[in-house]
Regions:
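Alpha-helical substrate-recognition element adjacent to the catalytic core
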Residues: 1-83
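Mg2+-dependent phosphoryl-transfer enzymes with acidic/Ser/Thr/Gly-rich catalytic loops
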Residues: 29-33, 71, 76, 85-159
Length: 159
């Protein structure tokens, strides 16, 4: 399987990227989020074939995200992160990676520093304008609707 020659880590935002950004609240106050199965397939089946590890860095904390990350075998999960770039730099250092070894996908202003720092970046089609202008690749799909899977496909063939 052909792959991007340098990328070894894919870092993903959650709300608005792996999900549609909506938070559903039931009558009893329970929160729910929707994740797309195509994104999950790409993370579990395609990334390992490419030799790329998945990671999540998100500003919110949620048991739902913890559960989904476990299902997808994402071992690098960081929730409630205020300074995403500092966390990303620390992770890169721990893994012995440079910015050019890291791909990042996110949708909002709090992702911009990471987007600018990484070697390859992308966003869902419905990202905020500043992000749409800053990334290397804008997905045709929206957040929570297969954008991450599309970005993973791009990692397969991007020189």
């Amino acid at each position: 399987m052909k792959k991007h020659p340098k990328i070894r880590l894919l870092v993903m935002d959650v709300d608005g990227t792996l999900t549609d950004g909506c938070i559903y609240i039931g009558e009893e106050g329970e929160m729910m989020k929707a994740f797309h199965v195509q994104d999950g397939y790409g993370i579990v089946h395609i990334l390992p074939e490419l030799g790329i590890s998945p990671a999540i860095i998100t500003g919110r904390s949620s048991k739902i995200v913890e559960k989904r990350a476990g299902e997808l075998k994402i071992h690098h999960l960081y929730q409630g992160v205020g300074d995403k770039l500092s966390k990303l730099r620390k992770l890169a250092e721990e893994l012995g990676l440079n910015p050019e070894n890291i791909a990042y996908i996110g949708d909002d202003a709090n992702d911009l520093e990471c987007i600018r720092w990484c070697g390859f970046s992308g966003c869902p089609a419905d990202a905020v304008p500043e992000v749409l202008e800053a990334v290397h690749y804008v997905c045709r799909r929206e957040g929570g609707r297969g954008a991450v899977r599309e970005f993973i496909s791009r990692l397969q063939c991007n020189p």
